[in-house]
A protein has these predicted regions:
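Conserved active-site regions of diverse hydrolases
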Residues: 2-412
């Protein structure tokens, strides 16, 4: 059997054996998603638990236990919206190829089992939750929906999701940015019913919202030229379009009492192993034409945030330039303790960028000396550094006009 066919069959088997649609919160969303019709190019569109497999590489996905926070909470709750950079298990409950519910994903996590995080260990919001004095944030589809489960935060992020509704559609089900905001709106309504409007508004306005979205609008839309988009939008126009869409969604969050937002810029995916392989880079040099688009988006988005500050003066919003923080690690890798900068820890092909991580046999022994975990995602070690930068600019300044520690510091 040709190797590519064999690997495709393995990937299909992993999808079929690791999902069983049967619990309330996820089943409700699954039914809504199946009944959802949407024009391909539209932007703002409107318990399933994995079963145990006889394979040693699959596990029942349970809620992730958190280490005890080191201090009293600095904010009431921590809410997360985004894509695979911060998905903590949402896609475990969806019919999709974009999933991380099998080893070696999660092998270096606190529990050493896969949780749905696209990493060998923790993702940035895990580190930041502990900094805030809160437990790890549970997935919206991975809990019962009771207010008690959600009172300290919810993670709505979904791998393959984008700002554009159809971004990532070729991978299967995913929850777009707009849909995630609708899910939060539903959560807010549950809070109002349970504790009253004033108490719910006070909780939300004092909580932190972390948004990491947009990379799939390049990977699975613009760079793949879906709907002939490259002939409709030049990169500059496409970036303006995305930034405008994000700004509008933040205004929508503001209208339901959100007042503290951390908006993440996009990382240098032109340096990701997949594009090093795809563009046949001989020596691992980054794909500059891709990185130029990402830098331009971050520039446009940062300016849009400046305008939001002027329009909504009581909105505390931070923009964190992931490109700056990530490139500092890539350029100064030895300073940070890395010695493998171009190859992923797990994958197949040159730079391990041809096929994503689907088997423990594909993974390196020591992920901590790698920058990249798989085709697109950084290792736990990189996530820890980036989280430090978001919190207090420990390694390099990448957040403007302040960092998260400043945002949540008690006001005198």
């Amino acid at each position: 059997m040709p190797i590519n066919l064999a690997l495709l069959l393995l990937l299909l088997c992993s999808l079929m054996t690791s999902t069983n649609f049967n619990t309330s919160k996820a089943l409700q969303f699954h039914q809504e998603l199946l009944g959802f019709s949407q024009d391909f190019d539209s932007i703002n569109s409107p318990s399933m638990s994995p079963t145990f497999s006889s394979s040693p590489y699959y596990y029942t996905i349970l809620p992730s236990p958190s280490p005890s926070p080191a201090s009293a909470p600095l904010v009431p709750a921590f809410f997360v919206l985004g894509d695979s950079s911060v998905d903590c298990g949402t896609n475990n409950y969806l019919g999709t190829f974009a999933r991380a519910d099998r080893l070696p994903y999660g092998r270096d996590f606190d529990t050493h089992v896969p949780t749905g995080r696209f990493c060998n260990g923790r993702i940035p919001v895990d580190y930041l939750a502990l900094r805030l004095g809160l437990p790890f944030v549970p997935s919206y589809l991975g809990q019962t929906g009771s207010v008690e489960d959600m009172i300290q935060g919810v993670n709505y992020a979904s791998a393959a999701a984008g700002i554009i509704f159809s971004s990532g559609s070729e991978l299967g089900q995913r929850i777009s940015f707009t849909q995630q905001i609708q899910q939060f709106t539903d959560t807010y309504q549950e809070f109002i019913i349970d504790m009253g409007e004033d108490a719910a508004a006070n909780l939300i306005s004092n909580s932190v919202f972390y948004v990491s979205i947009g990379i799939n609008d390049y990977i699975h839309y613009y760079l793949s030229n879906e709907s002939n988009v490259q002939n409709v939008y030049l990169p500059w126009s496409f970036n303006q379009f995305l930034a405008s869409s994000v700004s509008q969604e933040i205004k929508n969050l503001y209208n339901i009492n959100v007042r503290k937002v951390v908006l993440m810029g996009l990382p240098p995916i032109g340096c990701a192993p997949h594009y090093l392989w795809k563009y046949n880079r001989e020596n691992g040099e980054c794909v500059e034409e891709i990185n130029d688009m990402i830098m331009e988006f971050n520039f446009v988005m940062r300016y849009a945030i400046h305008e939001l500050h002027q329009d909504l003066p009581d909105l505390d919003i931070i923009f964190c330039d992931m490109y700056e923080g990530s490139m500092d690690i890539i350029k100064n890798y030895e300073h940070y303790g890395f010695n493998v900068t171009t190859d992923a820890c797990c994958g197949l092909g040159k730079f391990k960028g041809w096929l994503t991580c689907i088997s423990p046999d594909m993974a390196c022994d020591n992920a901590s000396n790698h920058i990249w975990w798989d085709q697109f995602h950084p290792t736990d070690a990189v996530n820890a550094i980036l989280a430090d930068n978001v919190w207090n600019s420990l390694h390099t300044k990448m957040c403007y006009p302040m960092n998260l520690e400043d945002m949540v510091a008690p006001k005198s």
